[in-house]
Amino acid sequence: MFHVEKQSGDKEKDYQLLLKQLEAMTEDETDQIANYANASALLYHSLPEVNWAGFYFAKEEDGQLVLGPFQGLPACVRIPFGRGVCGTAYANGKVERIEDVNAFPGHIACDAASQSEIVLPIRVDGKIVGVLDIDSPVKNRFDEIDEKYLTQFAETLEKALAQ
Protein backbone atom coordinates (compact mmCIF):
# COMPACT_ATOMS: atom_id res chain seq x y z
CA MET A 1 0.00 0.00 0.00
CA PHE A 2 1.18 3.51 -0.76
CA HIS A 3 0.73 6.61 1.34
CA VAL A 4 1.04 10.19 0.05
CA GLU A 5 2.84 12.32 2.64
CA LYS A 6 1.35 15.63 3.76
CA GLN A 7 3.13 18.82 2.73
CA SER A 8 5.36 20.27 5.47
CA GLY A 9 5.41 23.82 4.14
CA ASP A 10 9.11 23.61 3.22
CA LYS A 11 8.94 23.39 -0.57
CA GLU A 12 12.41 21.91 -1.10
CA LYS A 13 11.97 19.26 1.63
CA ASP A 14 8.55 18.40 0.22
CA TYR A 15 10.03 17.91 -3.25
CA GLN A 16 12.87 15.79 -1.85
CA LEU A 17 10.26 13.56 -0.21
CA LEU A 18 8.28 13.47 -3.46
CA LEU A 19 11.37 12.24 -5.32
CA LYS A 20 11.94 9.50 -2.72
CA GLN A 21 8.32 8.43 -3.06
CA LEU A 22 8.63 8.23 -6.85
CA GLU A 23 11.82 6.17 -6.56
CA ALA A 24 10.09 3.76 -4.17
CA MET A 25 7.04 3.45 -6.44
CA THR A 26 9.04 2.74 -9.58
CA GLU A 27 11.92 0.74 -8.07
CA ASP A 28 10.64 -2.74 -8.92
CA GLU A 29 7.94 -1.87 -11.47
CA THR A 30 8.81 -2.21 -15.14
CA ASP A 31 5.36 -1.51 -16.61
CA GLN A 32 5.46 1.95 -18.16
CA ILE A 33 1.74 2.62 -17.97
CA ALA A 34 1.67 1.75 -14.27
CA ASN A 35 4.63 4.04 -13.59
CA TYR A 36 3.15 6.96 -15.55
CA ALA A 37 -0.23 6.48 -13.86
CA ASN A 38 1.24 6.41 -10.36
CA ALA A 39 3.54 9.34 -11.12
CA SER A 40 0.59 11.50 -12.19
CA ALA A 41 -1.39 10.49 -9.09
CA LEU A 42 1.59 11.23 -6.85
CA LEU A 43 1.99 14.73 -8.33
CA TYR A 44 -1.73 15.51 -8.28
CA HIS A 45 -2.16 14.49 -4.64
CA SER A 46 1.16 15.89 -3.38
CA LEU A 47 1.48 19.32 -4.98
CA PRO A 48 -0.65 22.16 -3.63
CA GLU A 49 -2.74 24.28 -5.99
CA VAL A 50 -2.66 21.82 -8.89
CA ASN A 51 -5.79 20.98 -10.89
CA TRP A 52 -4.26 18.64 -13.49
CA ALA A 53 -1.16 16.45 -13.72
CA GLY A 54 -0.43 13.97 -16.46
CA PHE A 55 1.33 12.91 -19.60
CA TYR A 56 1.04 13.30 -23.34
CA PHE A 57 2.91 10.88 -25.61
CA ALA A 58 4.33 11.58 -29.06
CA LYS A 59 2.76 9.92 -32.09
CA GLU A 60 5.40 10.83 -34.67
CA GLU A 61 3.39 9.41 -37.56
CA ASP A 62 0.51 11.78 -36.72
CA GLY A 63 2.59 14.80 -35.67
CA GLN A 64 0.65 14.92 -32.41
CA LEU A 65 0.85 14.35 -28.71
CA VAL A 66 -1.80 11.94 -27.42
CA LEU A 67 -3.23 11.94 -23.90
CA GLY A 68 -1.74 9.42 -21.48
CA PRO A 69 -2.29 8.69 -17.76
CA PHE A 70 -3.40 11.75 -15.79
CA GLN A 71 -5.28 13.03 -12.74
CA GLY A 72 -7.83 15.83 -13.01
CA LEU A 73 -10.73 16.71 -15.27
CA PRO A 74 -11.02 15.05 -18.70
CA ALA A 75 -8.51 16.65 -21.06
CA CYS A 76 -7.80 17.37 -24.69
CA VAL A 77 -6.93 14.06 -26.32
CA ARG A 78 -4.64 15.27 -29.14
CA ILE A 79 -2.30 18.25 -29.35
CA PRO A 80 -0.33 18.98 -32.55
CA PHE A 81 3.45 19.29 -32.20
CA GLY A 82 4.37 22.96 -31.77
CA ARG A 83 0.87 24.03 -30.60
CA GLY A 84 -0.06 25.12 -27.11
CA VAL A 85 2.27 24.79 -24.15
CA CYS A 86 2.59 21.00 -24.42
CA GLY A 87 3.23 20.95 -28.15
CA THR A 88 5.76 23.78 -27.81
CA ALA A 89 7.68 22.02 -25.00
CA TYR A 90 7.79 18.87 -27.11
CA ALA A 91 8.88 20.65 -30.30
CA ASN A 92 11.56 22.72 -28.53
CA GLY A 93 12.68 19.91 -26.22
CA LYS A 94 12.77 22.18 -23.20
CA VAL A 95 10.76 23.06 -20.12
CA GLU A 96 7.96 25.58 -20.62
CA ARG A 97 7.01 27.39 -17.40
CA ILE A 98 4.05 29.68 -18.06
CA GLU A 99 3.00 32.21 -15.42
CA ASP A 100 -0.27 33.13 -17.18
CA VAL A 101 -1.59 30.67 -19.75
CA ASN A 102 -4.00 33.26 -21.12
CA ALA A 103 -1.00 35.33 -22.27
CA PHE A 104 0.63 32.36 -24.04
CA PRO A 105 0.14 32.60 -27.83
CA GLY A 106 -1.91 29.66 -29.06
CA HIS A 107 -2.70 28.30 -25.60
CA ILE A 108 -5.05 25.32 -25.78
CA ALA A 109 -7.57 25.64 -22.95
CA CYS A 110 -8.58 22.14 -21.90
CA ASP A 111 -9.70 23.35 -18.45
CA ALA A 112 -10.87 26.96 -18.16
CA ALA A 113 -9.79 26.99 -14.50
CA SER A 114 -6.10 26.59 -15.39
CA GLN A 115 -4.15 29.83 -15.01
CA SER A 116 -0.51 28.66 -15.02
CA GLU A 117 1.29 25.61 -16.35
CA ILE A 118 4.62 23.82 -16.43
CA VAL A 119 5.48 21.25 -19.10
CA LEU A 120 8.61 19.10 -19.10
CA PRO A 121 9.87 16.87 -21.92
CA ILE A 122 10.12 13.15 -21.07
CA ARG A 123 13.01 11.29 -22.66
CA VAL A 124 13.73 7.59 -22.95
CA ASP A 125 17.22 6.68 -24.12
CA GLY A 126 17.77 10.35 -25.02
CA LYS A 127 14.73 10.59 -27.31
CA ILE A 128 11.77 12.78 -26.38
CA VAL A 129 8.76 10.46 -26.11
CA GLY A 130 6.28 12.89 -24.59
CA VAL A 131 5.73 15.54 -21.94
CA LEU A 132 4.73 15.86 -18.31
CA ASP A 133 2.06 18.56 -17.98
CA ILE A 134 1.01 20.16 -14.69
CA ASP A 135 -1.66 22.87 -14.48
CA SER A 136 -2.71 25.18 -11.67
CA PRO A 137 -5.76 27.38 -11.12
CA VAL A 138 -3.36 30.00 -9.69
CA LYS A 139 -1.33 32.45 -11.80
CA ASN A 140 2.44 32.33 -11.22
CA ARG A 141 2.09 29.00 -9.39
CA PHE A 142 5.34 27.49 -10.69
CA ASP A 143 8.74 28.98 -9.88
CA GLU A 144 12.41 28.04 -10.25
CA ILE A 145 12.22 25.61 -7.33
CA ASP A 146 9.28 23.80 -8.95
CA GLU A 147 11.14 23.65 -12.25
CA LYS A 148 14.31 22.31 -10.60
CA TYR A 149 12.57 19.51 -8.71
CA LEU A 150 10.05 18.64 -11.41
CA THR A 151 12.98 18.28 -13.80
CA GLN A 152 14.51 15.84 -11.30
CA PHE A 153 11.12 14.11 -11.04
CA ALA A 154 11.04 13.66 -14.82
CA GLU A 155 14.64 12.40 -14.83
CA THR A 156 13.86 9.90 -12.05
CA LEU A 157 10.87 8.65 -14.03
CA GLU A 158 12.99 8.43 -17.19
CA LYS A 159 15.49 6.16 -15.38
CA ALA A 160 12.68 3.88 -14.27
CA LEU A 161 11.26 3.74 -17.79
CA ALA A 162 14.65 2.87 -19.29
CA GLN A 163 14.78 -0.38 -17.25
Curated annotation (Swiss-Prot):
<dbReference type="InterPro" id="IPR051330">
    <property type="entry name" value="Phosphatase_reg/MetRdx"/>
</dbReference>
<dbReference type="InterPro" id="IPR003018">
    <property type="entry name" value="GAF"/>
</dbReference>
<dbReference type="Pfam" id="PF13185">
    <property type="entry name" value="GAF_2"/>
</dbReference>
<comment type="similarity">
    <text>Belongs to the free Met sulfoxide reductase family.</text>
</comment>
<dbReference type="GO" id="GO:0033745">
    <property type="term" value="F:L-methionine-(R)-S-oxide reductase activity"/>
</dbReference>
<dbReference type="InterPro" id="IPR029016">
    <property type="entry name" value="GAF-like_dom_sf"/>
</dbReference>
<dbReference type="GO" id="GO:0005829">
    <property type="term" value="C:cytosol"/>
</dbReference>
<protein>
    <recommendedName>
        <fullName>Protein YtsP</fullName>
    </recommendedName>
</protein>
<dbReference type="InterPro" id="IPR000614">
    <property type="entry name" value="FRMsr_CS"/>
</dbReference>
